[in-house]
């Protein structure tokens, strides 16, 4: 079966879910919170780029949803009686990717405002399942649609930053295309928009407007990912819980906290999902007997948190945390580019860990153009019918090797040790060893990298024999572990010798706890009300399911911490203030 055949099969299999109609009972539940409107041919419901659209239900008439491609309208879908219009941008509050217009002489609709829609999806299960399942499936179909333009990244094929924009949009599940400037399509697009090589990389928004050499923050603003946390002229943002980091631990905490009524804000520096979001297939996650793509799993978790009212801001880089133990809002968080201060009653640190870099000559030259830290469909295209190198001996390396082996000619799994089973799960190690086009190179390291504009070959050395070999390859995948992202934290938050955050019994004798009437919760840090979960925490099990469990467990401790404050048993310590540096 060709890729086109698989796409056609996917569209057939998902059509009934993506375009489900609402029944009488569901309409009766939504009607009290909806506005009934009569429209005529040519009336526009919403335009591409608009935000906070709410839900439109067609009672009578016909509505086309279309996009503009280089001046021509292309209809994506036509809505009839009992159909509803939209995709997951309605949940997220991000920018509409298309325009909707009345095409019948007359039409009657029900419009559910965005604020009422979020409440309905959280509180009315009879409605939420049909709508949310459809919105998710529509986005999946849209991302798979080869004709849909969406956002377009125009760049040279070897432009490192252009590929970073591509990666950023991909990991944030924004439908987009990467277009090589030198291609026929790229040249035609650049001529129509009057772009030259000096303008690259350029992001062409779904509206058709070009954004020359944008920062990731500007990309996020155009895509609607960077949501304003504060209203204009506000100097403070208040939250019950602020979660820093949207990996599995942070996302799980967001779902539980928001569903339990806490005003929850999640700050993510790049894209939700963490390292799990970069995993092509997680096979040992509870409830998925055939495995699940890590990016898809964490995206669903993000949408689940949105449904319960959690507020995300991406990319939001936290610069510092100031602590005042005697205040109701004891944590003050400074965010890069945000004029307002975020104040929180409790904070969960779920920043995970950064990828470690290979100590190979010329490695810096090929970051993003040959050296990668995730194996997804984007990278898989580069590796098709090629020999590729994966470095590492843990589960991430094994999963990457298995995923790449499906399309690559050969996968060389390079490990420094002599036993693949020491760090890798047994089931995965056996699968890697049995895969015919995966070769494991024990006691081997990558020494040098070569290439012109992109990576072309690497030099490998056997540490035992000293023998060196040169391998022709377009890609090296580095899966050699990570270091905790804790440099922004104040020194009063205690860490172990490797920089991971101490919690629970390990901080019971910290100064802030010695004079406190209660003991720290299992995931609470050396500062009361500040929690840590997932890979950033000292002693945590570095697995996706474990991080999810810790996220949920942290929320239980947060409720206990907030209750102790309400009951009048705050810290007896005098005011403590901490900040970065």
Residue ranges of each PLM-predicted region?
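Rossmann-like dinucleotide/flavin-binding elements
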Residues: 233-272, 359, 365-367, 373-426, ...
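A Rossmann-like FAD-binding core segment of flavoenzymes
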Residues: 298-344, 349-351, 405-517, 560-581
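Beta1-alpha1 glycine-rich phosphate/pyrophosphate-binding loop at the start
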Residues: 153, 157-166, 170-184, 193, ...
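A generic structural signal for short hydrophobic patches within well-formed alpha-helices
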Residues: 27, 117-118, 219, 318, ...
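Short aromatic/basic micro-patch
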Residues: 21, 55, 78, 111, ...
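Structural motif
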Residues: 62, 106-108, 328, 341, ...
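FAD-binding core/adjacent interface of flavoenzyme oxidoreductases
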Residues: 166, 188-244, 259-260, 277-278, ...
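Cytosolic regulatory regions built on CNB/CRP/Popeye-like sensor folds
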Residues: 1-167, 171
């Amino acid at each position: 079966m060709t890729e086109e055949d698989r796409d056609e099969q996917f569209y057939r299999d998902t059509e009934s879910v993506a375009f489900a109609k609402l029944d009488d009972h569901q309409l009766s539940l939504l009607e009290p919170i909806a506005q009934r409107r009569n429209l005529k041919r040519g009336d526009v419901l919403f335009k591409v780029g608009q935000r906070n659209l709410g839900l439109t239900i067609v009672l009578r008439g016909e509505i086309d949803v279309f996009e503009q491609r280089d001046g021509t309208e292309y209809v994506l879908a036509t809505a009839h009686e009992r159909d509803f219009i939209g995709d997951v941008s309605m949940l997220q509050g991000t920018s509409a990717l298309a325009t909707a217009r009345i095409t019948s002489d007359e039409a009657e609709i029900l419009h559910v405002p965005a604020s009422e829609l979020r409440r309905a999806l959280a509180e009315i299960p009879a409605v939420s399942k049909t709508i949310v399942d459809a919105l998710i499936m529509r986005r999946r179909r849209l991302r798979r649609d080869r004709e849909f333009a969406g956002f377009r990244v125009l760049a040279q094929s070897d432009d490192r930053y252009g590929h970073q924009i591509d990666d950023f949009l991909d990991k944030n599940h924004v439908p987009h295309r990467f277009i090589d400037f030198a291609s026929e399509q790229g040249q035609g697009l650049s001529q129509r928009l009057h772009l030259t090589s000096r303008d690259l990389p350029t992001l062409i928004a779904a509206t058709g407007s070009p954004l020359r050499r944008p920062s990731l923050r500007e990309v996020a603003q155009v895509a609607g990912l960077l949501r304003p946390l504060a209203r204009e002229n506000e100097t403070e943002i208040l939250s019950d819980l602020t979660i820093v980091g949207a990996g599995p631990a942070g996302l799980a905490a967001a779902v539980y906290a928001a569903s339990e009524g806490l005003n929850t804000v999640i700050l993510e520096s790049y894209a939700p999902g963490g390292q799990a979001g970069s995993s092509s297939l997680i096979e040992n996650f509870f409830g998925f007997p055939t495995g699940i793509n890590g990016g898809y799993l964490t995206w669903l978790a993000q949408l689940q948190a949105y449904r319960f009212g959690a507020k995300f801001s991406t990319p939001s880089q936290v610069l510092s945390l100031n602590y005042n133990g005697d205040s109701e809002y004891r944590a003050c968080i400074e965010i890069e580019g945000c004029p307002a201060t975020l104040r929180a009653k409790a904070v969960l640190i779920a920043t995970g860990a950064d990828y470690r870099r290979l100590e190979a000559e010329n490695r810096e030259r090929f970051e993003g153009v040959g050296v990668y830290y995730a194996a997804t469909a984007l990278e898989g295209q580069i590796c098709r019918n090629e020999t590729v190198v994966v470095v590492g001996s843990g589960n991430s390396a094994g999963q990457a090797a298995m995923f790449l082996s499906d399309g690559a000619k050969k996968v060389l799994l390079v490990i420094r040790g002599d036993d693949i089973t020491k760090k890798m799960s047994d089931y995965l190690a056996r699968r890697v060893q049995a895969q015919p086009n995966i070769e494991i190179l024990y006691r081997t390291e990558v020494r040098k990298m070569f290439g012109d504009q992109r990576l072309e070959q690497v030099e490998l050395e056997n540490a035992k024999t000293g023998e060196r070999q040169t391998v022709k390859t377009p890609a090296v995948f580095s899966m050699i572990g990570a270091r905790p992202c804790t440099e922004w934290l104040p020194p009063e938050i205690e860490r172990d010798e490797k920089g991971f955050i101490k919690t629970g019994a390990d901080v019971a004798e910290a100064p802030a706890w010695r004079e406190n009437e209660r003991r720290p919760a299992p995931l609470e840090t050396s500062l009361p009300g500040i929690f840590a979960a997932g890979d950033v925490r000292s002693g945590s099990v570095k697995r996706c399911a474990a991080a999810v469990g810790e996220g949920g467990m942290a929320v239980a401790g947060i409720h206990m911490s907030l209750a102790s404050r309400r009951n009048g048993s705050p810290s007896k310590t005098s005011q403590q203030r901490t900040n970065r540096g």
